[in-house]
């Protein structure tokens, strides 16, 4: 019985990766992880102090998975962390230092000090973009223009750090592979501004020129004002892509699936077509994610269940459909349908045997009831899922005829099955239990 569901499906929380930089998710504790020992910390802070010469202020990245001003990461694979610190000196309010430090023979030393004219660090990430054994440092810095940042890249090896030419502007960037080569690329996403068009750009490393170059770019929806959630992953048939959930000014959500077409050597973004409605446009806060662990990114679409003529006091819920995206046909392919009770944190997977347009579901206080939809009106009740206060359930209050599916510290979730054996909607009790999921079980 499946009794939990990722927050990506329900959209009940904003994921860590929504801020940009990287599709991997870390806990806040990991993101703010300090140097490994007090001795190391003291040495690192002394190096920062010596470099600042007169006092300093640590600068914390605003977005991404690495939010600490002092980030510990093994850059060269020797199982010993290097340290990357961001700060500005006492009289350097418009300049930020990125100090790279390594430990050699038990003593911490400076491996690179890079000064950038900016006031804030947007985000930091690490990725293998040069195919060398070392991880590169990707640092994004803010500008005075909202939603416009600029990218810098550095590589560390044998105790020294050097610059990889970058300098691209972006609103958010993400690292990952769009093919099976094992080599990472950098995908920059740009929101529309007065100076920049909305687009996605795939950056790759040019070994001879020691620089990141734009391999391909594609237009994005200019009406998106914020990227809510972004994930690298497989679409279908071993084709990898980046799936971007963005928000309009109206708070409506829309998804764009971007992939590199090897035959044409171009980036494609087929779900966005100028002057055409994106089929993923929705008001329900559900996001793209691999929700069933099949390594395929699932893209949500939302539509209202049948409700014409139903009393306005009856709240008909939405049907959330999980789809895969096929690069071959550039189409969405339906996988599963769900009905969700957001107020009480549970949902029901719609049986595959139920035909679209023949059923509907209503949310009423703590319950969700399913009905047949016949002759354009509510038909017979099929089954109900109800959330009971856990203490009231234990006392047997108003729960006659209900069978518990799941209980936590707050609620007991129970069902009442009204389907009959000769009906096309017939479900066994076990099928109802299996179709049920809760959000964030305690």
Predicted regions located by residue number:
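Beta-propeller-forming repeat regions
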Residues: 19-363, 371-373, 392-395, 401-413, ...
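Secondary-structure transition/turn motif
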Residues: 371-378, 416-421
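C-terminal partner/receptor-binding element of secreted or periplasmic proteins
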Residues: 419-442
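A short acidic-to-branched-hydrophobic micro-motif
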Residues: 374-392
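Sec-dependent N-terminal signal peptides of Gram-positive bacterial secreted proteins and lipoproteins
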Residues: 2-26
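Small/flexible residues
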Residues: 4-6, 412, 418
């Amino acid at each position: 019985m499946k009794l939990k569901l990722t927050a990506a499906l329900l959209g009940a929380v904003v994921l860590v990766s929504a801020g940009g930089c990287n599709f991997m998710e870390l806990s806040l504790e990991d993101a703010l992880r300090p140097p490994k020992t007090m001795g190391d910390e003291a040495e690192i802070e002394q190096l920062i102090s010596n470099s600042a010469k007169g006092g300093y202020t640590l600068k914390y990245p605003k977005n991404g998975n690495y939010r600490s001003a002092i980030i510990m990461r093994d850059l060269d694979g020797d199982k010993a962390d290097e340290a990357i610190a961001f700060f500005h000196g006492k009289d350097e309010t418009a300049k930020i230092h990125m100090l790279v430090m390594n430990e050699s023979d038990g003593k911490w030393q400076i491996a690179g000090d890079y000064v950038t004219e900016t006031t804030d660090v947007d985000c930091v990430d690490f990725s293998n973009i040069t195919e060398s054994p070392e991880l590169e440092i990707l640092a994004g810095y803010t500008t005075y223009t909202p939603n416009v940042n600029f990218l810098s890249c550095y590589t560390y090896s044998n105790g020294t750090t050097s610059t990889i030419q970058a300098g691209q502007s972006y609103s958010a960037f993400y690292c990952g592979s769009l093919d099976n080569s094992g080599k990472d690329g950098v995908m920059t996403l740009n929101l529309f501004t007065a100076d920049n068009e909305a687009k996605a750009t795939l950056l790759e490393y040019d070994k001879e020129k020691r620089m990141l170059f734009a391999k391909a770019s594609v237009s994005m929806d200019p009406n998106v004002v914020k990227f809510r959630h972004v994930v690298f992953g497989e679409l279908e048939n071993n084709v990898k892509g980046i799936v971007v959930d963005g928000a309009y000014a109206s708070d409506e959500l829309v998804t764009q699936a971007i992939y590199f077409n090897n035959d044409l050597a171009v980036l494609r973004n087929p779900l966005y077509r100028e002057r055409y409605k994106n089929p993923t446009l929705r008001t329900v806060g559900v996001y793209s994610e691999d929700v069933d662990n099949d390594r395929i990114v699932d893209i949500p679409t939302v539509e209202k269940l049948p409700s014409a003529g139903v009393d306005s006091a009856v709240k008909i819920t939405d049907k959330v459909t999980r789809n895969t995206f096929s690069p071959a046909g550039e189409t969405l392919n339906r996988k599963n349908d769900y009905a969700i009770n957001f107020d009480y944190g549970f949902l029901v997977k719609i049986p595959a045997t139920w035909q679209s347009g023949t059923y509907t579901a209503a949310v009423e206080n703590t319950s969700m009831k399913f009905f047949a939809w016949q002759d354009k009106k509510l038909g017979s009740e099929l089954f109900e899922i109800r959330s009971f206060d856990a203490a009231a359930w234990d006392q047997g209050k108003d729960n006659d005829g209900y069978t518990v599916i799941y209980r936590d510290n707050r609620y007991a979730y129970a069902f009442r099955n009204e389907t009959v054996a000769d009906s096309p909607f017939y479900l066994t009790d076990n099928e109802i239990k299996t179709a049920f999921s809760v959000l964030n079980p305690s």
